[in-house]
Structures are given as structure tokens and as C-alpha cells.
Amino acid sequence: MSDDITSEAQTIAVGQLRAFIERIERLEEEKKTIGDDIKEVYAELKSSGFDSKVVRTIIRLRKKEDHERQEEEAMLQLYMDALGMS
């Protein structure tokens, strides 16, 4: 009986592992598709005359909280001033 329980537990564990792996594989494929879609949008953006590097910077900044962004901008300005770049 103990062997039956162990065998059943192993079967369940293998099934769970397989399910996790298959979910990850599906998500990785979706991630690739989304990445391709994003590249297409950037290509459209560029063909419309927008600077994709600047847009990427804006997107990065929009992800931050206001205080984080302001702190980063202040540090950037401080460093630029120190280097005579302002």
C-alpha cells in the first residue's frame, strides 16, 4: 500500500511539473509575440517621424513614481552642471 501511495504521489508530481513547464512555454511564446508586436509599433512610430529612443525614455520614465523621476532628473542635472554641460 505504501508503494501505491508513493507511486501515485510521483505521478501527481510529474503531472504538476509537466503542467508548470507547459504554462511557462506558452507564456514564453506569448512574450515573444508581444515583443514582436512592440517592435512593429516602434517601426510605425519611426516611420511617422518620431524618435524611438526618446519614446523609449519616456516610457521608462512613465513607469516611475513622480518622486523617483524628479530625483533622477535632479541628479542628472547636478551631474551635467558639474561637467559644465548645462
From Swiss-Prot:
Superkingdom: Bacteria
Molecular function via GO: DNA binding
User: Which Pfam families did the record assign?
Assistant: GapR_DNA-bd
Per the record, the similarity remark reads:
Belongs to the UPF0335 family.
What protein name does the entry list? UPF0335 protein BCAN_A1790
Q: Which organism is it from?
A: Brucella canis (strain ATCC 23365 / NCTC 10854 / RM-666)
